[in-house]
């Protein structure tokens, strides 16, 4: 999945719009369209991506070159909301329970690596290494999607009700990526059964003869 929008930048971040363009992941020695993160005093370079929808999975980073530190440290923060992606662990209820959503990773030149296994829509990336720059070719979402046959459907004359039904069905589907009702790993996996209950109750209440088949 390609990011849909850049919501925030901090420090020295150049050519950030390059991350919104679809590119091949094959990395060459002279990529013409890269986003550059540079730390040379002042706030660390950082940005916040919006993928436009919530999904289960992680992100894939394609790095062209790094200068300064050979294996720069990046901080990744995943969130179902902007507030969560911008929060530290312990702030506003954010946590790393069950599946880390806030952690540090190392990268290197000419690398193509995947990180994260959680539920999110937004991700913030910070360059932590001082006196270092990183040229990012691409950041994409890696969608973990179990192929499940939908047994029912619902459509009516109210577009809003149709949307509510679709969101409820999609929520149930996201929470079935591993064992049945096991849920996508995210900040608080224990909250998953509650989400499933709301979605499944809604679907059950709409089970009107001739409407859901």
Language-model features: locations:
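Extracellular/oxidizing-compartment recognition motifs
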Residues: 1-185, 195, 211-213
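Well-ordered alpha-helical scaffold segments within catalytic/enzyme domains
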Residues: 198-209
């Amino acid at each position: 999945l390609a990011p849909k929008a850049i919501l925030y930048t901090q420090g020295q971040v150049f050519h950030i719009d390059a991350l919104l363009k679809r590119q091949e992941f094959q990395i060459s020695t002279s990529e013409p369209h890269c986003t550059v993160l540079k730390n040379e005093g002042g706030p660390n370079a950082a940005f916040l991506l919006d993928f436009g929808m919530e999904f289960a999975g992680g992100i894939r980073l394609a790095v062209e070159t790094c200068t300064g530190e050979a294996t720069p440290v990046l901080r990744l923060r995943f969130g179902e909301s902007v507030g969560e992606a911008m929060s530290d662990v312990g702030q506003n209820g954010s946590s790393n329970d069950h599946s880390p959503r806030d952690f540090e990773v190392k990268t290197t030149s000419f690398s193509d690596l995947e990180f994260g296994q959680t539920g999110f829509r937004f991700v913030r990336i910070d360059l932590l290494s001082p006196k270092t720059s990183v040229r990012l070719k691409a950041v994409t979402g890696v969608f973990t999607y179990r192929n499940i046959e939908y047994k029912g459907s619902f459509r009516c004359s109210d577009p809003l009700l149709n949307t509510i039904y679709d969101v409820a069905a999609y929520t149930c589907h996201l929470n079935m990526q591993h064992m049945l009702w096991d849920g996508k790993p995210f900040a608080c996996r224990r909250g998953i059964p509650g989400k499933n209950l709301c979605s499944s109750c809604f679907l059950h209440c709409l089970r009107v003869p001739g409407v859901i088949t």
